[in-house]
């Protein structure tokens, strides 16, 4: 079986916004699932994260990748009008899965997430949301697909405490939730566990999420400075010079 370091190294030329720490979290969560489990990824882009999930998951784990590759919400500041690039992303996605040796393991649904609910009939053990970052679609993905996660299952959300839309979706859906407990994050990838929870657990979850708001505010400052081409100022404040993920 492949190990994490070799898989991550092999993805060096695969485009995407997943850091090493985030890839490790995906690897660990997928790798702990037993045969018969179901994993759904919303927002696959060129396959960087799905290659990690599928390489780590045990035989018998079912994996779905949902992405319309339609040219909207393609990436940072690429909200619409990228149909030609998206078709290229679609082809590259399939090629990257094949190159990683996991193409046959992944059921690819070229659809918007809200149109794919009937294609996945089982409950979910792991849900990874990295789709559109605006509030409405982000909250729809988390609400609609999060309801399919089993008690004890995990939800991972990319661009948490980084994107305004995604963070607002978390405020509405997870901060005060009786179902979702915040367990931590790898940069902007937040992890939640689903299940009935005590009041004490819910209060602790809320407190931990509130504690991430200074990180969120700093990310917004970085984004403004980078958009204004003020990288030196952003770096002086601690930015690596890259868009914060």
Predicted regions and their residues:
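S-adenosylmethionine/decaboxylated-SAM
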Residues: 2-20, 24-245
């Amino acid at each position: 079986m492949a190990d994490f370091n070799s898989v991550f190294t092999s993805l060096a030329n695969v485009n995407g916004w997943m850091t090493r720490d985030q890839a490790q979290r995906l690897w660990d969560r997928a790798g702990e699932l037993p045969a018969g489990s179901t994993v759904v990824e919303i927002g696959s882009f060129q396959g960087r994260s799905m290659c990690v999930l599928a390489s780590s998951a045990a035989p018998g784990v079912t994996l779905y990748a949902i992405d319309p590759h339609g040219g909207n919400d393609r990436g940072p500041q690429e909200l619409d009008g990228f149909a030609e690039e998206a078709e290229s992303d679609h082809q590259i996605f399939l090629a990257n899965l094949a190159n990683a040796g996991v193409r046959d393991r992944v059921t690819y649904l070229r659809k918007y997430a809200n149109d794919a609910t009937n294609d996945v009939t089982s409950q979910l053990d792991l849900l990874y949301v990295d789709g559109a970052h605006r509030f409405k679609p982000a909250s729809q993905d988390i609400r609609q697909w999060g309801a399919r996660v089993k008690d004890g299952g995990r939800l991972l959300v990319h661009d948490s405490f980084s994107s305004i839309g995604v963070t607002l979706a978390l405020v509405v859906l997870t901060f005060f939730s009786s179902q979702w407990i915040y367990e931590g994050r790898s940069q902007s990838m937040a992890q939640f566990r689903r299940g009935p929870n005590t009041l004490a657990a819910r209060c602790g979850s809320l407190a931990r999420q509130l504690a991430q708001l200074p990180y969120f505010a700093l990310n917004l400052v970085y984004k403004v400075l980078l958009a204004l081409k003020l990288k030196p100022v952003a770096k002086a404040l601690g930015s690596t010079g890259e868009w914060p993920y």
